[in-house]
Amino acid sequence: MQTSALLLAAQALVASAGLIERQSCPSIHVFGARETTVGPGYGSAGTVVNLILNAYPGSTAEAIVYPACGGQSSCGGISYGNSAMQGTNAVASAVNSFNQRCPNTQIVLVGYSQGGQIMDNALCGGGDPGSGITNTAVPLTASAVTAVKAAILMGSPRYRAGFPYNVGTCTAQGFAARPAGFVCPSGSKIQNYCDSPDPYCCTGNNQAVHQGYGGVYGQAALTFVRSKLNSGGSPPTTPPTTPPTTPPTTPPTTPPPSGSCAALYGQCGGQGWNGATCCSQGTCRASNQWYSQCL
């Protein structure tokens, strides 16, 4: 009799713990990924992350933990390609793990520059040869893909003109562009923002444009996210806030072998650059102290 009572009490505790865990899951959870050379946190992705959090009280967010590096000493000298590969794995791990804990929570992905590249890789698959990712499978589980309702990518080097989810004026491509004809199975969930003067997602030379997408397209991004989420959100109770950021840079993938010239749109110079300083096509133009590009 006493044993049965103890058994029932134990079962009740287990059920209660499960109920508490389920109740602690938010209706909406946002993952944000920062750009290259910015310290841990959301970086410029924070603008859109905060817009969503303010629009949906009770929603939660977390930053993807990854190097966000491009060979600079300030971030450990990790190459851009290796950083993007680690970041892609980090997105898959974080999103899959969260979805396993909270299967009914709607997920939104927000990635800026290199952060956009790793979100794109994780959601769309297709591999990323420049980052050493040869497996073309989507690294998110089927359940996690279903839970992801919207993805906002800004200034992503994977941008290529002509994709149905593109937004902006760029008619070219980024330095790590998707191959022509690529089809993302979750394309209807994506908005990919890129304007023509951007030197990283496009072929321009204006760093300020690369850093300005949150201010230019933030409200449009929020409108898109609202259209994709199942539950309506009340208007923001406080004005959206934008965390302070330091101007980052997003250099391209591993330098070409010394002795050869960089290809069109490739890197040809910059502080700490040890690769080619000539261009097989175009002219080497400096965008900033870290990055010169063949244009």
From Swiss-Prot:
Main location: secreted
Known outcome of mutating residue 210 to A: Loss of enzymatic activity and attenuates virulence
Highest rank taxon of the organism: Eukaryota
PROSITE patterns: CBM1_1, CBM1_2
Catalyzed reactions: cutin + H2O = cutin monomers
Sorted UniProt keywords: Disulfide bond, Hydrolase, Secreted, Signal, Virulence
Residue ranges occupied by any CBM1 domain in the UniProt entry: 260-295
Pfam families in alphabetical order: CBM_1, Cutinase
Biased composition (Pro residues): 236-258
GO molecular-function terms, A-Z: carboxylic ester hydrolase activity; cellulose binding
Cleavable signal peptide: 1-17
PTM text: The 2 disulfide bonds play a critical role in holding the catalytic residues in juxta-position; reduction of the disulfide bridges results in the complete inactivation of the enzyme.
Gene Ontology annotations for the cellular component aspect, listed alphabetically: extracellular region
Protein purpose: Catalyzes the hydrolysis of complex carboxylic polyesters found in the cell wall of plants. May degrade cutin, a macromolecule that forms the structure of the plant cuticle. May also degrade suberin, a specialized macromolecule found in the cell wall of various plant tissues. Allows pathogenic fungi to penetrate through the cuticular barrier into the host plant during the initial stage of fungal infection. Involved in pathogenesis.
Protein name in UniProt: Cutinase 11
